[in-house]
Amino acid sequence: IHPKNFKENFYQNKKKRKILLTIDDGLLSFYENAWPILKEKKIPFILFVSTREVGSFNYMNWEQILELHESGLVEIGNHSHSHEYLVDENPKIIKNDILRSIKIFNEKLGKNSIFFSYPFGEYSLEFKKIIKELGFDYAFGQHSGVIDETKDLWELPRFPINEKYGELKRFKTLIKTLPFKYEKITPEDRYLLQSNNPPNVKIFFKDNINYLKQINCFSNEDNKWRKSNISFVEENILEIKISEKFIGERGRINCSLREKEGFWRWLGIQFVIAEK
């Protein structure tokens, strides 16, 4: 779908599967290799750029970005100014960084984008609050999953496709995934301190998900992927028991459920682990 049609596709009852293509960082290799193909095929997408990096080594410059911007195919999305680990910073530093990027967007493109992509896909409740206050309508993480009308507008999932996870076979699997519809996931803050690591995770699913009790979840607790210990504490409330702390920068949980005709429901959760 074209980014300009994202809102109507988000709220409509989607009977047909649709894809929104997003590209992070604005690397020169994308401009040289992928852009000519996407332009020829008239495939729309969002290109998220960090304003500090524009024009530096191996990154696109503003002239190239303007070319995409004026093509009618591309939305230039905001990816912060510095692309640092902002989630670990205090709110003032986060806000000033994003304000700087907005200023440059207005100077170079005549407007800021309504789309934001969190650097490294990392966010907290505080970071989300800042993004909402600064006027962004949508924000994307890097946790895997399918967008539907139950998803939080400021923590939208995406399936990463890169040099590590870019095989055509995987892509064909991804386009046969379906959403898990849910009311909420707790804890709501995806930023974990040492005091609440590991978290007590609960997913409050919407009604009428077929075969929900057959769901499987996996987590990378203790830096080792393993099948999670799960149980339904109520009919549609799943508890995921994480026995070991998440180690490193991120903790991940992926849940899946096989549907008919080779389709899968998929839901990913990403936690950011505080430095201290």
Task: Briefly describe each language-model feature range.
Residues 10, 122-124, 144:
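Generic alpha-helical secondary structure signal
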Residues 1, 15-19, 27-127, 137, ...:
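Metal-dependent polysaccharide deacetylase catalytic core of the NodB/CE4 family, i.e.
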Residues 1-20, 29-63, 160-276:
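Terminal accessory/targeting
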Residues 136-145:
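Acidic, His- and aromatic-enriched active-site or binding-groove loops in soluble protein domains
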